[in-house]
Structure formats: structure tokens, C-alpha cells
A protein has these predicted regions:
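C-terminal leucine-rich, beta-strand-based interaction scaffolds used for sensing/assembly
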Residues: 82, 224-227, 245-273
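Substrate-engagement module of ASCE P-loop NTPases
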Residues: 117-131
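Conserved P-loop NTPase "ATPase switch" module shared by AAA+ and STAND
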Residues: 78-83, 88-117
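Structural recognition of the conserved hydrophobic beta-strand(s) that form the central parallel beta-sheet
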Residues: 98-99, 130-139
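Amphipathic alpha-helical "lid/sensor" segments that cap RecA-like P-loop NTPase cores
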Residues: 1-5, 128, 138-150, 155-254
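Post-Walker A helix-loop "phosphate-sensing" segment adjacent to the P-loop in P-loop NTPases
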Residues: 66-76
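Walker A/P-loop nucleotide-binding motif
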Residues: 43-61
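Charged, amphipathic alpha-helical interface modules that flank catalytic cores or transmembrane segments
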Residues: 1-36, 42, 63
Length: 273
């Protein structure tokens, strides 16, 4: 582990964290996406893994990070840009890992400002071939216009929802067999219903009292938790848009959100407020 720039207590915490990652990694099913991310981080100094909630961004990033230890990299899990500047060591191969870069449900302006302030310093550090960054990022955060102010993190994107990166039916079946064991065959017709299939498998694995077919067909508890988190995270804009989608039966017109709307539409909205 890192000895020169990282405090001993942080080293101990990271060692414990890596042991937990290794234990959790026993449930990882090797995918084409994971192989692609590994190839990208080996040939690029900074890689951002994007996708919607539950598609396996964090799990994939951690799996690839563990593989990089085989190339002599020390792994350091950080939450802010100052840590990268503080703990970077030109004499050691270091892979910095970041979860939910710049926010979860919406782009967090405070986080963005921090990364903007340190952007050039970090860019300079990455000129050292032994220093790399791998981050996971929600797609709605990554696609925010302001995220373009961080070109380091847009230079190499691995979007787990793209056709060449998304899980194949064979990979989904292997994941189901890993987590559901004998129940995997019961849900084979539902594996393509939701992008967050990997999350559903993990949730079922953690609570096997659930009825497998009902859960994978209609995972209402997952939706409920995500909606609650939108409110908790104060993502009021997205919360309101979701409400509008429900009110208008998922038939929102773009001009209703970007232009002045007529009185009839205003009355419909007021009626449901």
C-alpha cells in the first residue's frame, strides 16, 4: 500500500475496504463491459463509467480496480479532488477510485465547483503514467451541460447502457444463476424488463423471502426507494418532472418545459397540485 503520502490510518481503512471489495467480488460475473473498462483504464489516464441506477457501475469499477492491483497499482478510494492532489505519488502506481462523481440524482454544484478548481492540478498529475483515475457517474449527472466543464472526465466514457456495453442475455442469465440459484429459471422471461436487472438480483439475494416472479416482474419497492431518495436528495426539479409524467400519462411535450404554456395546461397542472 501507499506509505509516503497517505496517513497510516487512511491506509488501514483502505486495506479494510479492499478486503470487503474482494469478498463482494466473488459474486461478480465477468462481462464484456468489464473487459472493455479494464482495457480503457490500461490505455487512458482517466475513465468515467456511466449508466443509470442499478446497472452495475460501482460493482464494475471496483472489479476492474481489483484487477489493476495485479499490474502493481495501489488503489485509493477518494471522495474529493483534494485527496488526489494530496495523496498522489509520482514514485508509485496509483489508481484513484471515485463513486458518484459530482452527485447522484442531479449534478451537485458544490462538488462541481471543487472539481473545477482542482481540474488543472489533477490534469498535471495525470501526466505521470503511474497515476490514473476511474470514476462512476450517474448518466443524468454526466449529461448535464455543466459536466462538460470537466474535460478530464469526458475524454473516455464507458456507458454501460450502450448496445456494445450493455449486458447480453447470456450474461444476465449467468448473473441470475449466481444470485438466484435454482430460482433463476423462474425469472428468465423477465430479464430484459429493466436496465437495473443487476440491482434486482442483489436485492433478491439479500432477501430471499421475496416471491421471485412477482419481484422481477413488478419491483415496486425499488421504484419507491428511488422516488424517496429524489425527495431526500432535494432533487426537486426531477421530482416535479416525474410528477408531470404521471399527470400527463408519460406524454409530455418538450415545449411545455422549454416555452410558455397555455392556460389549459396550467389549469391541468394546478388541479393536481
Amino acid at each position: 500500500m501507499l506509505k509516503d503520502t497517505v496517513p497510516w490510518n487512511m491506509m488501514e481503512q483502505m486495506t479494510t475496504k479492499l478486503e470487503k471489495w474482494k469478498e463482494e467480488d466473488q459474486m461478480f460475473v465477468e462481462t464484456g463491459a468489464a473487459k472493455h473498462v479494464l482495457k480503457c483504464i490500461k490505455t487512458n489516464s482517466c475513465v468515467t463509467v456511466t449508466g443509470s441506477s442499478g446497472v452495475g457501475k460501482t460493482f464494475t469499477v471496483r472489479h476492474v480496480a481489483l484487477q489493476m492491483t495485479g499490474d502493481g497499482y495501489d488503489i485509493l478510494h477518494v471522495t474529493n479532488p483534494e485527496d488526489i492532489v494530496r495523496f498522489s505519488n509520482p514514485n508509485k502506481k496509483t489508481l484513484f477510485v471515485i463513486d458518484d462523481l459530482c452527485g447522484t440524482y442531479t449534478l451537485n454544484q458544490t462538488y462541481l465547483d471543487k472539481w473545477k478548481t482542482m481540474h488543472e492540478d489533477i490534469k498535471g498529475l495525470l501526466k505521470n503514467d503511474g497515476t490514473k483515475i476511474m470514476a462512476s457517474c450517474r448518466l443524468q449527472v454526466y449529461q448535464d451541460e455543466q459536466f462538460k466543464l470537466l474535460p478530464l472526465f469526458t475524454a473516455c466514457e464507458c456507458n454501460l447502457l450502450l448496445q456494445n456495453m450493455s449486458l447480453s442475455d447470456e450474461e444476465k442469465q449467468l448473473i441470475a444463476e449466481k444470485y438466484l440459484k435454482s430460482d433463476a429459471s423462474k425469472i428468465s422471461q423477465y430479464i430484459d424488463l429493466f436496465d437495473f436487472f443487476p440491482l434486482l438480483c442483489r436485492l433478491y439475494y439479500e432477501n430471499q423471502t421475496l416471491n421471485a416472479v412477482d419481484f422481477f416482474k413488478n419491483p415496486f419497492s425499488v421504484y419507491e426507494e428511488e422516488i424517496d431518495k429524489l425527495k431526500t436528495e432535494k432533487a426537486y426539479g426531477k421530482y416535479c418532472v416525474l410528477a408531470l409524467c404521471v399527470m400527463f400519462n408519460n406524454h409530455l411535450k418538450e415545449e411545455w418545459l422549454t416555452e410558455d404554456i397555455n392556460e389549459d395546461i396550467k389549469q391541468i397542472i394546478k388541479k393536481h397540485m
